[in-house]
């Protein structure tokens, strides 16, 4: 994938310094091969071909300018190994990413931009291709769509209004980095024309249909109307049975030509109206025992006098009561007056509603 700017991908290579080689030739070749491995074809620049630079010998007449100077710290490299990237050399410990400061001595590639060293992650996060819709990075393995120099993820190339993903060969409009399908692009043009005719100032961004505008509005439910014959049939049935069963509903549907659901709803509405206009009578709770007294106190109730043939048994008795007492073989008459015993009348008794006080006598 092409990289923006003039950044080039370079390979790092470990080179021998002033000391004689103590490594086996196969090990050196394996290390050089590992360091020269290229990661993908993302760089437009051809990686630099590493070359082995031998340090100047003591008998050589090469000036001191030929010394191996580290590009990072500026000191002479006297170590046994050094790293070389695009004809620039570093100490093994000095080659690191300029952003995250991660050492690149174990990496087989790095990236240079404006004389700055970057690791792969930081280079692509700063200079890599990004999606014009979501702003995230586009990797080399991602499928993309391009429009007017912008790159989009395949899923991000969708209409801004209806969120529908556009397919290959489909017409679309691009308005201020917003992708519109043909339908909503024409809607935007109509909004601009209507605003111009009415003299209203409408910006281009305001003319773009929003996501709420693209959603279809729910249609209003059509009200059901009944003919006089249909109402007559249903009202006659309601007078007989206000809650018909499924079989009766089917018969009414066949007679009126309406659906069972419509007839069922009509009966539900009629029952609700009938219940609303019918006076409600209070019903005593089923768990409470019946009582003969109202909720008011008994002292506040005025009673009517009680007259009954048996009243004589319940009044005070005076005088003598004849009683036979057996005294041996002699029968005699003794005067006897029974002491009164006052008892409270039971509220639930038959006399509680008469207000009489009962006086009983013992014999």
Curated annotation (Swiss-Prot):
Q: Where is the composition biased (Pro residues)?
A: 281-292
Q: What are the protein's UniProt keywords? A: Developmental protein, Differentiation, DNA-binding, Homeobox, LIM domain, Metal-binding, Neurogenesis, Nucleus, Repeat, Transcription, Transcription regulation, Zinc
Would the keyword Chloroplast turn up in this protein's UniProt record? no
Tell me the first and last residues of the signal peptide: none
Q: In which tissues is it expressed?
A: Brain specific. Expressed by neurons in the amygdala that are activated by reproductive olfactory stimuli and project in regions of the hypothalamus involved in reproduction (at protein level).
Span of domain LIM zinc-binding: 70-122, 131-184
The record's statement on gene disruption is: Mice lacking Lhx6 fail to thrive, develop general weakness and die within the first 2 weeks after birth.
Functional summary from the UniProt entry: Probable transcription factor required for the expression of a subset of genes involved in interneurons migration and development. Functions in the specification of cortical interneuron subtypes and in the migration of GABAergic interneuron precursors from the subpallium to the cerebral cortex.
Please state what the protein is called.
LIM/homeobox protein Lhx6
Give the species.
Answer: Mus musculus
Gene name for this UniProt entry: Lhx6
């Amino acid at each position: 994938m092409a990289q923006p700017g003039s950044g080039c991908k370079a390979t790092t290579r470990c080179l021998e310094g002033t000391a004689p080689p103590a490594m086996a030739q196969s090990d050196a070749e394996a290390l050089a091969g590992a360091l020269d491995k290229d990661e993908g074809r993302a760089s437009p620049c051809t990686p630099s071909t590493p070359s082995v630079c031998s340090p100047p010998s003591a008998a050589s007449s090469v000036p001191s300018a030929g010394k191996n100077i580290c590009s990072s710290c500026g000191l002479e490299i006297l170590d046994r190994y050094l790293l070389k990237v695009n004809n620039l050399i570093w100490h093994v410990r000095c080659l690191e990413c300029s952003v995250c400061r991660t050492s690149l001595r174990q990496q087989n590639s790095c990236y240079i931009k404006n004389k700055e060293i970057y690791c792969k992650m930081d280079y692509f996060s700063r200079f890599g291709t990004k999606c014009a819709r979501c702003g995230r990075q586009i990797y080399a393995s991602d499928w993309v769509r391009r429009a007017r120099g912008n790159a989009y993820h395949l899923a991000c190339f969708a209409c801004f209004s209806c969120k529908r993903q556009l397919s290959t060969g489909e017409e679309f409009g691009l308005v201020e980095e917003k992708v519109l399908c043909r339908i909503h692009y024409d809607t935007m043009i109509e909004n601009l024309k209507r605003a111009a005719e009415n003299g209203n100032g409408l910006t281009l961004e305001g003319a773009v249909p929003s996501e709420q505008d693209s959603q279809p509005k729910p249609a209003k439910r059509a009200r059901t109307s009944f003919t006089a014959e249909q109402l007559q049939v249903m009202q006659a049935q309601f007078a007989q049975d206000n809650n018909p069963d499924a079989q009766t509903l089917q018969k009414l549907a066949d007679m009126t030509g309406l659906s069972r659901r419509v007839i069922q709803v009509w009966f539900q509405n009629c029952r609700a109206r009938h219940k609303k206009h019918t006076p409600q009578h209070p019903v005593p709770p089923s768990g409470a025992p019946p009582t003969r007294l109202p909720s008011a106190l008994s002292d506040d109730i005025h009673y009517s006098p009680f007259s009954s043939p048996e009243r004589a048994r319940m009044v005070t008795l005076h005088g003598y009561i004849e009683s036979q007492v057996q005294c041996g073989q002699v029968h005699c008459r003794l005067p006897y007056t029974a002491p009164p015993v006052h008892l409270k009348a039971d509220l639930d008794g038959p006399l509680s509603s008469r207000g009489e006080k009962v006086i009983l006598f013992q014999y």
